[in-house]
């Protein structure tokens, strides 16, 4: 367990077994990676255990099934655990949806929603409250996606983009371009579907790519917005990113987004980005097993660790450059310019500060949007996620 004496003994035994003494280079065992796990970003990222360079600060205690810490600008991966493990992404997949569709429509464009636009939204979806017959700007629809994780807003934008099927095809193509090879897209909203998976590495790629777009960056950093309620009326929506708003957990200084997610199957997943001292870090945490706040607390702890380690610890891998941005004929999985390769100096050590549970018990609580009367009814509320143990389906 991270921080436990047992993990210390594991690393010590491994070192003794190899006869390498205190300078040993070992990797803590972890859950087996998916059979199709890729080593995009460096050989060490294909391993299932904790990957961190020797001499790095002590890692915090963590319960996530997979996580990753990376420098947004250099692409250096500072530490990871099961980086390529394929897991259900929940609404964090909306980052790929936004990265794919957001550049296609001007934010001031207006769309009058039809019933057909709202067809096929899964029961139990998180909703912002889009109504057929009401006109919305593209900006308002994206606010519904980023702030409230509204699947109704996602489906309207997908309809504008040629339909759900076409949007899924484009998202998969974009994932391929980003070299997010662990990701299989079934729906644009991230809702639970058989075979819909991503990884901590891929979600970090989506966030890194998305944050290059000023609109993407602005939406995920927005705390509140007024959303149309029909006619001239509006109601306020609040971002469900708790590290941004400070709802239920302490807000994180310097946080700039990006996206949280929850389903009853996927558990809690979050990719966050923060800037301090001119350095921007990305952290993805997938499926911690200890309550709905854990995903935020573990993200904050890893951000703190990353800012302490950046510039001091050698990277264990890299966020690769999109294929479309590489010179023609360049090999896939090329590191970013200036980024250290997976074989950089600094041997892996047993991260005795870190332990990982490997069960599928996840906590969560929130209000559930409802389907009724042949239409979509969204509950106006200050926060979809609220403490108290009430089960939620997606957020």
Where are the regions a protein language model picked out?
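Penicillin-recognizing serine hydrolase domain
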Residues: 2-10, 34-62, 166-343, 358
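Compositionally biased, intrinsically disordered low-complexity segments
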Residues: 13, 21, 29, 352, ...
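A signal for specific C-terminal beta-sheet/loop modules enriched in small/flexible residues
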Residues: 88-97, 101, 295-309, 395
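Conserved SxxK-family serine transpeptidase/carboxypeptidase catalytic domain
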Residues: 309-395
